[in-house]
Amino acid sequence: MTALDRRYDTQIHRRVTRTVMVGSVPIGSEHPIAVQSMINEDTLDIDGSVAGIIRLVDAGCEIVRVTTPSIGHAKAMGKIKAELSAKGCNVPLVADVHHNGTKIALEVAQHVDKVRINPGLFVFDKPDPNRQEFTESEFAEIGTRIRETFEPLVKLLREQNKALRIGVNHGSLAERMLFTYGDTPKGMVESAMEFVRICDDLDFHNIVISMKASRAPVMLSAYRLMADTMDQEGFNYPLHLGVTEAGDGDYGRIKSTAGIATLLAEGLGDTIRVSLTEAPEKEIPVCYSILQSLGLRKTMVEYIACPSCGRTLFNLEDVLHKVRNATSHLKGLDIAVMGCIVNGPGEMADADYGYVGKGPGIIALYRGREEIRKVPEKEGVQALIQLIQEDGLWVDPDETR
């Protein structure tokens, strides 16, 4: 398939990557795109952290990240893992390590399934306000120090067959990268590639990469450039997508979707996190909605509904609400609710079932493209349920919990 053909293809073709196991969850192009989040409890609060992780898992989270800013926090991860195991919860855990984190990472690697490091902070020198440039020798000297500091962690993760996320943040690039490449996607990519090349030299390949920024255009550019750079150098590591510091409410969700969905539609991305300034479990439905909207994972009913107009023969918003309340537990179905017969039958043709205004007070029920029966509007929702039951696709809500 040519690039032009791919541009107009209705199927998303994912960038081919290797598989990286994070605990029991595979990340890579041959597997469903994994959904993850991060608790906001203090890691030293063992009970609170365990409760937060379980809330995320109950919401559908598949990988959970936990902050580990000190050795004490790293050791607490062992207790958290044990408490979760005792409760029958074996969700993969990721430790988040930042400033000068070698000792922390070496400790926490014993207790988790993946370690996330930030290349801009892993070997951290306080910026010098009087510095005018970085010479090649100064740049190389810090690179040598990074390798010496990073190598023990890579070897430990390799021995334990655990995973690493090289997680670049646009807002925390190292001073030498800023001087050399500027505050740019190129600087983000080179920051990650420095660590990728060290891992490759040490024959360690359980790597996932992220290139997060708080502005979607920067994030989009960085991920695209990262994928291209890896392709050029022969690397095929999976990508973790996210827009960092997206905020809250509708705008936070829209901002995250603008970045994440755009890349997913281009075939980039193997695991995602929507970062909201809200309870972490509220991030999870947004992730699944993004994936379903692109046809990448189907975990809920797909509702197709017109926006309503003067031709609409019933209160579309109220009816859609009633249909959703009655059927939202039927995962995997497509149900269309259309206001009239002008566009309804054609626009809902791909749906499993259709509920269409046929005339004043009358609705028609469809199975695919076939009209099955007409019923009074007041009986419409129950008649839809009956049709689904006749086809053997109905389950009671309690059975899906």
UniProtKB/Swiss-Prot annotation:
Pfam families: GcpE. It comes from the Bacteria. GO terms for biological process: isopentenyl diphosphate biosynthetic process, methylerythritol 4-phosphate pathway; terpenoid biosynthetic process. Its cofactor is [4Fe-4S] cluster. Pathway: Isoprenoid biosynthesis; isopentenyl diphosphate biosynthesis via DXP pathway; isopentenyl diphosphate from 1-deoxy-D-xylulose 5-phosphate: step 5/6. Binds 1 [4Fe-4S] cluster. The keyword Metal-binding applies. It catalyses: (2E)-4-hydroxy-3-methylbut-2-enyl diphosphate + 2 oxidized [2Fe-2S]-[ferredoxin] + H2O = 2-C-methyl-D-erythritol 2,4-cyclic diphosphate + 2 reduced [2Fe-2S]-[ferredoxin] + H(+). Its EC number is 1.17.7.1. SUPFAM superfamilies: Nitrite and sulphite reductase 4Fe-4S domain-like. InterPro entries: Dihydropteroate_synth-like_sf, IspG_bac, IspG_bac-typ, NO2/SO3_Rdtase_4Fe4S_sf. Keywords: 4Fe-4S, Iron, Iron-sulfur, Isoprene biosynthesis, Metal-binding, Oxidoreductase. [4Fe-4S] cluster binds at C306, C309, C340, E347. GO terms for molecular function: 4 iron, 4 sulfur cluster binding; 4-hydroxy-3-methylbut-2-en-1-yl diphosphate synthase activity (ferredoxin); iron ion binding. Converts 2C-methyl-D-erythritol 2,4-cyclodiphosphate (ME-2,4cPP) into 1-hydroxy-2-methyl-2-(E)-butenyl 4-diphosphate. Belongs to the IspG family. This is 4-hydroxy-3-methylbut-2-en-1-yl diphosphate synthase (ferredoxin). It comes from Synechococcus sp. (strain CC9902).
